[in-house]
């Protein structure tokens, strides 16, 4: 029987050499998850933890038509300061390290995606048990579908905005959407928060800035780091895309248009040196990583990128809103 992982904090703030060991770690992680499921009652998990573990063990894989790069492995790396990329080729996941434990932002689309993230965390030399808090950009399956698995495997607390709490716990997107409810594995929320919530862990502070629209509780996270003596502001923007949302006559999210408009203005006003989005293509992360590997110390630094991201998102939103209004001229916003 595989023993539970060590609770010893790993040494943060350096990039250990990545090897093929992350691939070999997959089977041991799966065994560890089964060990925790079988022994949840022994370590304080209780009936709920055991039930969730059982569901995860038997739940079929969903969204088989998702883009291949959403689950394609990529070597993890340090971005700036104490921030590490631990996601797949197409879907971001960010580890924010501290001397008192780490924060993980986003989870991938499924248990499989969560295990990919876990292997990347371990490949960087960190311990899964040192991940103390899980946070999320928004309650869509591609970013939240692996939260339950990560919570079971790390023992971390899950922090979710109040607007997305129900979606995370019920296991599906809330709001009228042309793509349907897009189910995901539900996860128990430990802390629901509002705007400007601060998450402090060691020397790291993250601030939640609610930017609803894409989902009701869409959350943009900000933090500050130091890179070789240079202070940098970092923003993890929540998506601003429409992504199938019904903008005209949305009964489940009646203020959706006003929410989008307020979020465009709010995000545009955030001072940002480094923008780290939830999808690779939203920030050309692969190209930036190649620049970094070639020795560019400012590969991820661009003080104008967030405003360009917002401008492009707002233009696309206005175009889609006009289309929906033309298609339903008698409907109310």
Predicted segments, located by residue:
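Active-site HxH/HxHxD metal-binding segment of metal-dependent hydrolases
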Residues: 112-115, 119-198, 294-295, 301, ...
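Metallo-beta-lactamase
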Residues: 65, 72-73, 78-80, 115, ...
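Active-site environment of divalent metal-dependent phosphoester hydrolases
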Residues: 112, 139-145, 165-168, 216-219, ...
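Active-site neighborhood of phospho(di)ester-bond hydrolases with catalytic His/Asp-centered motifs
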Residues: 105-108, 131-139, 159-161, 211-213, ...
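Conserved beta-strand hairpin/beta-sheet module of binuclear metal-dependent hydrolase folds
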Residues: 69-124, 128, 221-242
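Glycine-biased, low-complexity coil/linker segments
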Residues: 20-21, 31-36, 42
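Bacterial N-terminal signal peptides
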Residues: 45-59
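Accessory terminal helices/loops
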Residues: 65-69, 228, 242-333
């Amino acid at each position: 029987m595989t023993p539970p992982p060590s609770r010893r904090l790993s040494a943060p703030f350096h990039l250990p050499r990545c090897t093929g060991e992350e691939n070999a770690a997959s089977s041991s992680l799966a065994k560890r998850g089964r060990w925790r499921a079988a022994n949840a009652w022994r370590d304080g998990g209780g009936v709920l933890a055991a039930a969730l573990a059982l569901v995860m063990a038997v739940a079929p894989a969903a969204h088989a038509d998702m883009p291949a790069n959403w689950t394609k492995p990529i070597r993890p790396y340090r971005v700036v300061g104490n921030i590490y990329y631990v996601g797949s080729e197409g879907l971001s996941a960010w580890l924010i390290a501290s001397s008192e434990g780490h924060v993980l932002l986003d989870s991938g689309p499924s248990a499989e995606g969560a295990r990919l993230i876990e292997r990347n965390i371990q490949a960087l030399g960190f311990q899964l048990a040192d991940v103390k808090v899980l946070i999320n950009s928004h309650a869509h399956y591609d970013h939240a579908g692996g939260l339950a698995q990560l919570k079971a495997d790390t023992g971390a607390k899950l922090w979710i905005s109040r607007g997305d709490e129900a979606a995370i716990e019920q296991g599906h997107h809330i709001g009228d959407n042309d793509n349907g409810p897009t189910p995901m594995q539900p996860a128990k929320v430990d802390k629901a928060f509002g705007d400007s919530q601060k998450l402090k862990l060691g020397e790291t502070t993250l601030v939640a800035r609610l930017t609803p629209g894409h989902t009701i509780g869409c959350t943009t996270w900000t933090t500050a780091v130091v890179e070789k003596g240079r202070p940098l502001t970092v923003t993890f923007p929540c998506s601003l895309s429409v992504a199938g949302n019904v903008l005209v006559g949305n009964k489940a999210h009646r203020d959706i248009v006003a929410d989008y408009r307020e979020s465009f203005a709010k995000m545009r006003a955030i001072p940002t040196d480094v923008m780290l989005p939830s999808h690779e293509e939203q920030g050309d992360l692969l190209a930036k990583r190649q620049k970094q590997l070639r020795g560019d110390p400012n590969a991820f630094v661009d003080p104008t990128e967030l405003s360009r991201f917002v401008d492009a998102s707002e233009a696309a939103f206005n175009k889609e809103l006009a289309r929906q209004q033309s298609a339903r001229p008698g409907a109310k916003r």
